[in-house]
Amino acid sequence: MGMGEPLANFTEVMKAITYIHREDGINISYRRITISTCGLVPGIKRLSELHLPVRLAVSLVAADDDVRSSVMPVNTRFPLSELKKALISFQHRNEKRITLEYCMLGGINTTEKAAKSLQKFTKGLEVLVNLIPWNPIDSLPFSSPLDSEVRKFTSTLKSLGVNYSIRREKGRSADAACGQLASETMKSNLIKQ
């Protein structure tokens, strides 16, 4: 995964996917290509209409509109109800399991209520919820969840029948984990100015 929103640049991303798939390109099967999105509903709908057997990963972060809108402004444009309809359509046409990326923010989206909201959102979808502990960034007001929070949250998800995995943390101690490198680059650029 990289920075940027692929579905905001749909035409170019489709050109890239076509090249990646072509035998005279990189020759990678569509089934091994994943498009990650923050949840741009129009782009998901367009992707559905193409019937490409690519995988889809959606940064969900929260399954409650108020919480998701507070950490992901895209949710104010495309609330969860619209996102879910688009995902159902995508899954109906592509018959692929969807990955929901769920960055765990300490004390914000790791509660029992959050787990129940997540279970409700995933009902009727074939998904894998990829739980990702937040990597601390000095300039942002979020904290990593405590181990006890993660255990309680995953225990609740398990009891609710939510299919999940926990991403193994890499690079956190060197400030080189997901999200941290961009933060360091921005900080470095500000210092130079």
Where are these regions (language model features)?
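Radical SAM enzyme core and accessory elements
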Residues: 159, 169-193
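Conserved AdoMet/S-adenosylmethionine-binding subsite of the radical SAM
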Residues: 2-160, 164-165
